[in-house]
């Protein structure tokens, strides 16, 4: 199963890393969840391997982590929508890939590394397809144009428990709003 949530708030995006990822698995005290970069876009920015907090936060702030340059024209401005102030720019999309509960139980309670490896392979296959259809919308002169980029900048974080501390194998993909 895949669920998705849009992250608009820069403050929430910044605190997400600090609260849930940098300090460890948000479900198990003392555990550290090391994220890993994914995507052609990440590679083109020189991002590979383990995610460093400074790089993640720079991207959330629309900055190239290597050079400090602004990545997109739109900044995190706000607009009025339905009487509420709303951010103009999406910081990232949070996709969560979860196998059925029975698969999590077999993988984690029986400590079956083959099932965890199968989950990881399935994620990689899904993400290759995900990236093949990656697109961005360009707005110019009051008209929208969708452009296929075939690249993403994303962080992958695999967890093995739910917030209730139940066995729950799942991988969070934070697809940042950057196309290069």
Where in this protein do the model-derived segments appear?
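Intrinsically disordered, flexible peripheral segments
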Residues: 1-169, 174-180
